[in-house]
Amino acid sequence: MGTDAAGHVARSTIRPYSETPNVTRGGAPMRTFLRTADGVAIDSVYEPGGVVHDPGNVVYEQAEEGSRNGSGNAVPSVSQGLVLVVAHGFTGDADRPHVRRVAQVFARYGAVVTFSFRGHGRSGGRSTVGDREVLDLAAAVAWARELGHTRVVTVGFSMGGSVVLRHAALDTGDVEAVVSVSAPARWFYRGTAPMRRLHWLVTRPSGRLVGRYGLRTRIHHRQWDPVPLSPVEAVPRITPAPLLVVHGDQDAYFPLDHPRMLADAAGEHGELWVEPGMGHAENAAPEPLLRRIGDWAVARAG
């Protein structure tokens, strides 16, 4: 697994249609493809904060290569403060309603970057179910920094929750704080029926066909080699960045021993919120919880 900072492709900036409401805090929303360190195009959306637009109402615009920001045009004025980079769960993407809902809540606290992991949505490549996805997140974080943001908080759900942990461990100092929601602590867990179904989806040719045509997720056929650092192994390497672990007590995928292992590994740098009645990942995260996460991010990112 390479840990170099992700590179960038020629950026395709977006412009809102004329009827789109003005964005508060200055700047305009953008949508672009980023290039990861291993050459995968990642569909990414930037919202300056205050108002989140429907990403379907913006268009890609081919930009010139070679400038500092990947385009011949000046980057719009943006906040120099907090940005929340959202990493969705397996089978999600930047256009999914639950991801847009998360972005809408987080926009009250700062700018928001959402993106589609490889093999998901409009992004290229095929999903490696949390392995090389760390490079996708690295590209999104680098983009946020390039746009001028000095405080970055990554927020990941399920698969994305494991990715934000490994990214922070591999790129120490690249983020100010990390939030991991509904994440596994260890790999290859098959202790619940949903996880057994997921392993069938990922490891069997027939399962990958279901993933492609039923779930709009293109899954790589190769097994991990080598096996990446597990989430619980990654957590101690995140320090001194603060870590928030969030998990629902009704999560059907990963029981509560997973978040407790992560919190124990974090020691004094970690917090654990066990949410009564909550199920799994962004689909199950209620708005009050998302607001509490936003408050935590503002407080911990400095």
Model regions and ranges:
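The serine-hydrolase catalytic nucleophile loop
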Residues: 90-103
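Conserved alpha/beta-hydrolase
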Residues: 103-124
